């Protein structure tokens, strides 16, 4: 275990950043591939099947958002414990995060069993689409414990600087999902239900592999999964992990509201465009999120060790990389949006509508990189509330924007422009807070040197 824990307070920052970020980015792409694999096969069934899964996926996204409590909680509490030289504390936080994530998954599963139908009714779908969406949602509930525990284990490995293990395990899960999707959906004729079952089986395999790997690696000399929860540590985990979790939930609620507007303005083609377009767009923001998670770990260790100059340098190097990704995303989405969308949905009406979506949201990609990278900095500092507040306010601005732009007669484009403009505003706001933090820390260092 000792060689698995990397000291990120020493050595070349670029090397640390890319060594940790690349496997995390790979893991993010695996998650994208999970979703796009389902979309590709379901797109071959019908656009209605795609709309059904897209609507159900929003609520699965809400559930998965709560897994961030322990994923981010693990990354920050454990990395800061390692950076400060408190290994026993880091070990205890590992146990607390895993046990807490299991309890959260069971609670969320119970809530969804009771209210799944009511939640899906928020989309006002036609009966046939609603029925398929409900089937997909119910079957997906089986995978909740796997999702939550996997998120916690991933956070633990990221915190110690070993992002390769989650990547390798995720690859095996993806391979399983890609093999099972066509078998369950077409060969066995299970359709939408087959897509859900393929994903659940893959998630279960990933969890089993994590359990085996953690035991084999003897992380922190071996730590128990089921423990008595200690309020002091749980409170710290909640302080760090809770702000990003409601952020994703509230973001999903906005998506539900906007989804209703899209359904009204564009029917099931509009819903399929938004949900599929979001999966395509995730190619850029998931890449940036991989860098952000690596940045969180590096910042966590160096901040706890009092090395603020390395914190600042790590942020600048991460941002230079994500901005390149953002500019490339803009070029691809604006100029080749139709061709990209047609790879997933072969229906002409759908991929032409998708090209309009990608062309508009593509304009905001670089600004989205600013927001996401700054999140990684503030997460590592333990100040998760700041990016959460910026994102919540910026995301909720989409609602009045949609109403305003729609009143101008923009049709469904009103929704796409609201998404793009709000992303630009959030990126600029996070840049402002970063500059303010840098100025304040420089002043503090200057005062300390004078003293």
Please report, for each region that a protein language model flagged, where it lies by residue.
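Helix-loop interface residues and adjacent transmembrane-helix termini in multi-pass membrane transporters
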Residues: 33-36, 44-47, 81-84, 159-160, ...
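Hydrophobic/aromatic residues in alpha-helical transmembrane segments
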Residues: 22, 38, 74-75, 115-116, ...
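Hydrophobic transmembrane alpha-helices of multi-pass small-molecule transporters
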Residues: 62-65, 177-182, 207-211, 282-286, ...
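Membrane-helix interface/capping residues of multi-pass secondary transporters
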Residues: 39, 47-50, 87, 163, ...
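Transmembrane helix-bundle signature of multi-pass secondary active exporters and lipid flippases
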Residues: 24-76, 140-147, 235-302, 322-329, ...
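Small-residue-rich hydrophobic transmembrane alpha-helices
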Residues: 50-110, 147-166, 273-331, 335, ...
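Short runs within selected transmembrane alpha-helices of multi-pass transporters and secretion channels
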Residues: 71, 139-158, 166-177, 195-208, ...
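Short alpha-helical transmembrane segments in multi-pass integral membrane proteins
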Residues: 1-24, 78-145, 187-242, 299-364, ...
